[in-house]
């Protein structure tokens, strides 16, 4: 397959550049519940229900919090992405394959820029992406 005419590649970050088995999202999911508990002084069950309701109604918990509760997205993203990334290990084979692709490589995420940078650093892919 000739890929030489492709000048840009966009890769999703979470559960794409690393396996869903790494359980990173479960940490983020828990942090979303914690954020709602702290912001609205509700118990864990109510916070979980709010989180899932907004996810279903608005596509993301954050979108619902912004529209219904006027939550600052940067504050939310900073809080929920303050997680432990130590389980992420470099995948040298994947890194090598991506490096060999012609053109520029970019990472796309609905997370924060800091989260993307932290994940890329933990995966030792800093030099691969723009």
Model-derived regions, located:
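N-terminal helical cap/lid subdomain that shapes the substrate entry/recognition surface
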Residues: 2-11, 16-93, 103, 114
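Substrate-recognition/cap helix-loop segment adjacent to the acidic, metal-dependent catalytic center
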Residues: 96-106, 110-130
